[in-house]
Regions:
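Structural core segment of the AMP-binding/adenylate-forming
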Residues: 1-68, 80
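ATP-dependent adenylate-forming carboxylate-activation enzymes
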Residues: 3-16, 30-32, 172-191, 201
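Residue-level signal for inorganic ion chemistry
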Residues: 17, 26, 49, 169, ...
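Conserved helix-loop-beta element of the AMP-binding
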Residues: 22-24, 41-53, 76, 144-147, ...
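Adenylate-forming
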Residues: 26-38, 54-55, 150, 177, ...
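Conserved pre-ATP/AMP-binding loop-to-beta segment of ANL
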Residues: 72-92, 96-97, 135-145
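Conserved AMP-binding A3 loop
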Residues: 86-126
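Conserved AMP-binding/adenylation subdomain of ANL enzymes
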Residues: 109-149, 153-196
Length: 204
């Protein structure tokens, strides 16, 4: 079960969040390595740290390089999910520390599909219909090209900005810069012909 982590959290918030989630693996960009170093000794449940090289810091001692871990890994057997499997999203902690909200796949996925329908997406009756729907949308040049202008650790950014387009064969455009740069956002909109811009005003 993966969880979202707010990139602006300080050490005490990160310790609480990762401990509360019973996290066993942490993926982090190199620019956050100093913050991770400062808390790793207080997180005994973490079994592995995987660092994504962003050109800012050398590989943290004890961490595994993300790209190397992929290239050296063997193909894993596929395992089936059930409706009882959990997807967990941590709240923003505006009324105390963040809370882990658990959604069963059997309830979350139908809810997302209903949202997709309300937004104009064609929802398949059966998974076997999905390929046809995506093919038709591509031929009609109506596939979603979404830019989540709010952080992906926010539910709105992840659900509306990323999940829905991916569910329907669309494209998700991301911006590598932290924070909100309106000029950069509009440059990406024009460059990638974005037709869905998702934003939350106070989530930066």
């Amino acid at each position: 079960v993966t969880i979202n982590v707010n990139y602006i959290y300080k050490e005490n918030e990160l310790i609480y969040l990762l401990d509360n989630a019973d996290a066993e693996a942490v993926f982090f960009q190199g620019c956050y390595s100093e913050r991770i170093k400062a808390i790793k000794d207080q997180l005994p449940k973490i079994k592995v740290y995987i660092q994504i090289d962003d050109g800012t810091e050398p590989l943290m001692e004890g961490a595994i390089d993300y790209e190397s871990s992929i290239s050296s890994s063997k193909e894993q057997k596929r395992f089936d999910r059930t409706e009882e499997n959990i997807y967990m999203l941590y709240t923003g902690g505006t009324t105390g520390m963040p809370k882990g909200v658990m959604y069963k796949h059997g309830g979350f996925i139908p809810s997302m599909l209903k949202t997709a329908f309300a937004m104009g997406f064609e929802v398949p009756e059966d998974i076997s219909d999905l390929e046809k729907i995506v093919k038709n949308a591509k031929e009609n040049d109506s596939l979603s090209v979404s830019l989540p202008a709010c952080p992906l650790m926010h539910g709105t950014g992840m659900w509306l900005g990323a999940f829905l387009p991916m569910f329907s064969g669309g494209t998700v455009v991301t911006i590598s810069d932290l924070g909100l740069d309106p000029k950069k956002v509009w440059e990406e909109v024009v460059k990638n012909k974005v037709n869905s811009l998702v934003i939350v005003g106070d989530a930066f």
